[in-house]
């Protein structure tokens, strides 16, 4: 989180400190994490990132958390070259991200839930919940069981 500058409203541009808030108090727009990219550029390089373990946590400075807490290696899923689909679409190269091998629940939802669960623990939350009938609920349950 040392490179997080704060939160910015996607609709009106209002800024907030990086704390437990997700909507703008003025317009109820969603808040997005703002980063100090010049500081990141001075501190980290592509070679540093590539030398780290293969999980989403190799990008820690670019994530809105302090340390990985949930213990899952979510996010480092393979890119699969789609030659025939590329030809059909008229593009030179096309790669698809295979999130069916993501951990712990084999869903693309695991990537974002790993980060959300980690941030929730950092903010002191001990109970997690979500409105879902599918993959999101499974991922939240798996991460909550490990995180708390």
Predicted segment positions?
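PLP-dependent amino-acid enzyme catalytic core
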Residues: 1-148
């Amino acid at each position: 989180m040392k490179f997080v500058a704060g939160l910015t409203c996607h609709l009106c541009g209002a800024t907030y400190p990086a704390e437990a808030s997700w909507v703008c108090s003025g317009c109820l727009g969603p808040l997005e994490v703002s980063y100090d990219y010049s500081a990141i550029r001075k501190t980290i390089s592509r070679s540093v990132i590539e030398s780290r373990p293969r999980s989403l946590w190799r990008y820690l400075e670019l994530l809105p958390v302090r340390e990985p807490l949930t213990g899952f290696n979510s996010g480092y899923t393979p890119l699969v070259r789609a030659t025939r689909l590329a030809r059909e679409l008229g593009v030179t190269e096309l790669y698809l991200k295979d999130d069916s091998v993501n951990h712990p629940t084999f869903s693309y939802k695991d990537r974002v839930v790993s980060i959300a669960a980690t941030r929730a623990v950092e903010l002191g939350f001990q109970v997690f919940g979500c409105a879902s009938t599918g993959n999101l609920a499974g991922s939240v349950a798996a991460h909550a069981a490990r995180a708390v």
